[in-house]
Amino acid sequence: MPVNQAAPLLEHTLIDLLNDMRSRAQVAASSAERISLTRDIALCSLAFYSMHRSYDLSFTLGCQILKLPNCRGLIFNFQFDKTLRASSEAVVVLAARDCPAVCAFRAVTAYILAAKRMGWDLTTGHLFPVVAAGGHRSNLPLPAARMTTALQAHLRVAGLPSHFTMQSFRVGGSLSKSLVGTAVDEIIQICGWKTESVAKCYIGATSSGKVLGSKRTRGQSYASASELPLSPEFQKYLLACARKD
């Protein structure tokens, strides 16, 4: 069944958007505006590089995040309700990157630190809450529909095309990975797609399992070039944390 695919938002557009949002956050007139922008910077970065649905991000909890040793990155243990996906959970590693403009790890950690200065404790409750009046933290998660409304407003302010939706990050992120040679198996695992046929609708994967420009094929081991290996001890710690209620 064909996917009603959103327009892909690619990395160069993301960089322009995030740079504009960071500039606005620095001169924000209120604490509520500043933390809202900082939250949305983290949200957009995470949506692109994790390639997860806005609904998943809306209900992501602070307790589902682990920080890798020596500031090497973050581990997200996304957990889902009953869905048509391959699994009810997905572990995604966001490794620190050299370029601050496109480093989702830095964007998320900057948001967590900014929230802490506001008196928010993001280790409990939703990671991306609604910002209430006065910059207070609401107990409600930021709804997926509101994420798209905010995204399009940010795009208009930045002078960028505003037809994108939150799904555009998922499409653009997966397409960007395919264009640099990432194997289809890896993209399927990160995105949580159930079958390769779904991946084809997004990234044009071939029936042999290759993606545009890919040097790897199906059957080869999953190893992301952007992810750092975990020690056996830390893997055990991660699994123990991921299984907690």
What are the residue ranges of the model-derived segments?
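Extended, non-catalytic subsegments within catalytic or DNA/protein-binding/adaptor domains
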Residues: M1-D245
